[in-house]
Amino acid sequence: MSQLTHINAAGEAHMVDVSAKAETVREARAEAFVTMRSETLAMIIDGRHHKGDVFATARIAGIQAAKRTWDLIPLCHPLMLSKVEVNLQAEPEHNRVRIETLCRLTGKTGVEMEALTAASVAALTIYDMCKAVQKDMVIGSVRLLAKSGGKSGDFKVEADD
């Protein structure tokens, strides 16, 4: 079993030293969902929300969050991201919005936390913008979909997950 990388021999939290690692292209994809009433989703889709374009605002929030992950998550390295993508898709058949993010860089450490943070903050932004019309929306299923690059190798969720 793998060891926790952010815990030293004394059991204390520490930032991992990545100075000796090789720079490689690293990429991660994550997703999150915001489930809501059909009326709330229709308001977003139809552009009838009084606060403006919910998807555009959530997209910008997700991108900004990925760039600030190091400031939000203890022990994360500040990264020079070369790409952050936040895609939002209304799924009326499930009364939800699906958020999928992608982060990429050439560097010494992975971008999983950046992709997850982007998805989470985009979901939180949708909640924030819509809470006046529905407070019982559910943010859920935030997860890593795939990662590539780095010493630990590639990861991809199974198709049936």
Curated annotation (Swiss-Prot):
Catalytic residues of the enzyme: D128
MF term (GO), any: cyclic pyranopterin monophosphate synthase activity
Claim: Transmembrane is one of the keywords in the record: no
Binding positions (substrate): L75, C76, H77, M113, E114
Catalytic activity: (8S)-3',8-cyclo-7,8-dihydroguanosine 5'-triphosphate = cyclic pyranopterin phosphate + diphosphate
Keywords: Lyase, Molybdenum cofactor biosynthesis
Pathway stated in the Swiss-Prot or TrEMBL entry: Cofactor biosynthesis; molybdopterin biosynthesis
InterPro entries registered for this protein in UniProt: MoaC, MoaC_bact/euk, MoaC_sf, MoCo_biosynth_MoaA/MoaC, Mopterin_CF_biosynth-C_dom
Gene Ontology BP, a term: Mo-molybdopterin cofactor biosynthetic process
Enzyme Commission number: 4.6.1.17
Annotated Pfam families: MoaC
NCBIfam families: moaC (TIGR00581), PRK09364.1 (NF006870)
Family, as annotated: Belongs to the MoaC family.
Function: Catalyzes the conversion of (8S)-3',8-cyclo-7,8-dihydroguanosine 5'-triphosphate to cyclic pyranopterin monophosphate (cPMP).
Subunit and partners: Homohexamer; trimer of dimers.
Record's protein name: Cyclic pyranopterin monophosphate synthase
